[in-house]
């Protein structure tokens, strides 16, 4: 009955808001069991939570017409939560504590909760749509809760090797209890209802005391306070002539800001003989000797530079750090990242940090290293996410200490492991009260010191193809849950899913005329692009992207695109300087002007043909990901190509790439299908010790 009611009322809607305004007028009272009556009927299990719902005014809502998901914590969970939060607050008031940690809870007694805290806790556990566990895929629950927050999902196994699902780190103990107006899932812990910003969330965790102190003293906590742009008023608009078929696409539903902090726990600092902020600053002066300003809040201070390198303006969940096992489905669109990659294809992302330097995040799927970590646990490199991973240190042999790799005169750590949050949550001895998700960002714990050094990065980490998906260049696509979109950001469609990017929505994009329609199309299994998604620009397009900063040096800048009869003639600019002659995007790679020849039609596996194409300024697509059109490696796909835009010296300054349609007879139907960029050090291109297949990845 519930599903029939829901479909009957919602079937005509082509899009819905993920946080709906719930009409409480003319409520229909069900004769059967509702979510609210079910909870009340089982008060011996949910009585404390029922009290909170009543105080917040939500119990009557859960007894009335609608469609809801309720994650219901047990009485034990509520009692434990109140005691823990009260203890955290009281401990922060003791002598020697750096500052008060305000949890909103100042008593372990349920009756002492304020109305506002009851409201926050209650709304955290209720979603305005009904979802069974079979509806939940990926890394977030498919709708925001009534607090306008996404809840994270993770999976594991219990002591009997049975599958277990976690919501915001809380284990589902009983699930999929369907009622007339929704579904109830029982959770073993209260879901973190924190409205803390990222710095405040870090401050609440005692095992991050040194990092939190450094974050505060440098003033960098002030750069991570934004959450939502309340001046953004275009959520309900649609842009005409925006998709590949000249159809309309919606504007983004919101403009959220987001951040990620990679944090060393105190135990990591202690292992490196760092016990307080003075010790850390002394070491920072060794790692950043040119940062000589003694003022901690100066960008020219060594401590400031150390902390800034840990911070991103992208809100990255653990399962979105790299494109691995990413799934999504909305309407008629489905996506599984593993359908798009070779099993041993490394997964890498590159982001500019608040230091203005690049951080590499990688899961080395091609590695066969298996070794015990510091606790004796056997770990596989191929299933581990690293920061600043280097192939060089294990190219010819396994490092002597695979989980503590250090190089150079300063012994800079590489292959810094990002700890799996499921493991961190389970280790309550070392990480009590770990809470990964803040209001506006994510906290990741790392197992070693994270240090930036130009020479080390250029020589060990970024000495290869730096491939960056266009969607990763624009933080707002990640922060608003549009990149790798899975139907949870606010719209539901029956076919393709995409969003128009209005001018001024992101500081990382410039649009130079009103006819330009720059849009993002979310991944689907039928797309041939890297990571399954793409950006398009329709009409008389003229737009630019901000490039991430790389270590100073000479690089080959490449751009990947899919050609076609309606793809225009493009003039490229880098930093407002014309680069070469206009490029005809209307031809495919097997056109003689590009010169593609399939590897299996040559006598040397395509080596000579690669050189011929490169002399014309082109490369075949990489072999490390798949194009469904050819049923195999994208290298075989003749509709796509990589273009060498320019070879130039990139300084520490900010650089832009501009893409302009100069097709004089375009009637507005041309569009530019762009996929990723590559920045490749010229020094790496000259190396002869790199295997051919590695260079083709």
Can you name each region flagged by the protein language model?
Residues 1-18:
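Sec-dependent bacterial lipoprotein signal peptides
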Residues 18-697:
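Mature, structured domains of secreted/extracytosolic soluble proteins
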């Amino acid at each position: 009955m519930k599903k029939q009611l829901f479909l009957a009322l919602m079937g005509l809607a082509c899009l819905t808001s993920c946080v709906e305004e719930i009409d409480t007028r003319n409520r229909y009272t069900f004769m059967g069991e509702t979510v609210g009556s079910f909870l009340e009927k089982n008060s011996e299990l949910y009585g404390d939570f029922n009290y909170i719902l009543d105080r917040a005014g939500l119990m009557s809502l859960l007894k009335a017409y609608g469609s809801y998901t309720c994650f219901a914590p047990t009485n034990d969970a509520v009692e434990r939560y109140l005691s823990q939060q009260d203890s955290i607050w009281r401990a922060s008031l003791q002598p020697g504590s750096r500052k008060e940690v305000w949890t909103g809870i100042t008593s372990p007694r349920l009756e002492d909760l304020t109305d506002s805290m009851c409201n926050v806790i209650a709304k955290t556990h209720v979603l305005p749509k009904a979802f069974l566990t079979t509806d939940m895929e990926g890394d977030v629950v498919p709708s925001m809760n009534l607090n306008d927050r996404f809840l994270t999902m993770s999976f594991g196994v219990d002591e009997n090797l049975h599958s277990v699902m976690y919501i915001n780190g809380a284990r589902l103990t009983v699930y999929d209890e369907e009622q007339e107006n929704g579904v109830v899932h029982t959770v073993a812990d209260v879901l973190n209802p924190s409205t803390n910003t990222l710095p405040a969330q870090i401050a609440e965790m005692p095992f991050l005391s040194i990092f939190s102190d450094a974050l505060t003293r440098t003033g960098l906590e002030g750069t991570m306070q934004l959450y939502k742009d309340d001046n953004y008023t275009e959520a309900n608009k649609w842009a005409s002539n925006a998709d590949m078929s000249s159809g309309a696409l919606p504007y983004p539903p919101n403009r959220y800001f987001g951040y990620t902090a990679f944090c060393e726990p105190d135990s990591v600092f202690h292992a490196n003989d760092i016990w307080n902020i003075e010790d850390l600053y002394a070491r920072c002066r060794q790692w950043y000797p040119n940062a000589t300003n003694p003022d901690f809040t100066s960008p020219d201070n060594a401590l400031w530079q150390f902390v800034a390198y840990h911070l991103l303006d992208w809100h990255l969940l653990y399962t979105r750090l790299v494109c691995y096992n990413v799934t999504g489905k909305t309407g008629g669109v489905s996506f599984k990242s593993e359908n798009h990659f070779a099993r041993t294809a490394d997964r890498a992302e590159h982001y500019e940090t608040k230091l203005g330097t690049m951080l590499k995040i990688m899961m080395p799927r091609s590695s066969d290293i298996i070794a015990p970590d510091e606790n004796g646990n056997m770990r596989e490199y191929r299933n581990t996410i690293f920061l600043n991973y280097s192939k060089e240190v294990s190219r010819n042999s396994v490092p002597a200490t695979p989980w503590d790799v250090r190089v150079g005169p300063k012994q800079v750590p590489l292959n810094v492991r990002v700890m799996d949050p499921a493991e961190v949550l389970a280790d309550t001895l070392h990480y009590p009260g770990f809470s990964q998700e803040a209001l506006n960002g994510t906290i990741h714990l790392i197992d070693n010191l994270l240090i930036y050094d130009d020479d080390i990065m250029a020589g060990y980490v970024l000495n290869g193809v730096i491939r960056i998906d266009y969607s990763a260049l624009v933080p707002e696509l990640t922060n608003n849950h549009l990149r790798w979109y899975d139907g949870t950001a606010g719209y539901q469609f029956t076919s393709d899913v995409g969003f128009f990017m209005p001018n001024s929505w992101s500081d990382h994009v410039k649009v130079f005329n009103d006819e330009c329609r720059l849009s993002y199309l979310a991944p689907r299994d039928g797309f041939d692009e890297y990571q399954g998604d793409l950006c398009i620009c329709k009409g008389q397009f003229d737009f630019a992207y901000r490039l991430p900063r790389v270590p100073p040096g000479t690089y080959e800048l490449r751009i990947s695109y899919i050609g076609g009869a309606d793809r225009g003639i493009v003039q490229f600019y880098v930093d407002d300087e014309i680069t070469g002659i206009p490029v005809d995007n209307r031809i495919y790679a097997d056109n003689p002007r590009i010169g593609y020849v399939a590897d299996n039609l040559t006598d040397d596996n395509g080596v000579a043909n690669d050189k011929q194409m490169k002399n014309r300024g082109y490369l075949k697509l990489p072999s490390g990901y798949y194009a469904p059109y050819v049923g195999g490696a994208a290298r075989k796909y003749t509709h796509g190509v990589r273009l060498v835009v320019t070879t130039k010296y990139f300084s520490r300054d900010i650089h832009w790439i501009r893409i302009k349609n100069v097709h004089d007879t375009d009637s507005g139907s041309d569009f530019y299908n762009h996929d990723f960029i590559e920045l490749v050090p010229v020094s790496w291109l000259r190396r002869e010790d790199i295997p051919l297949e590695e260079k083709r990845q």
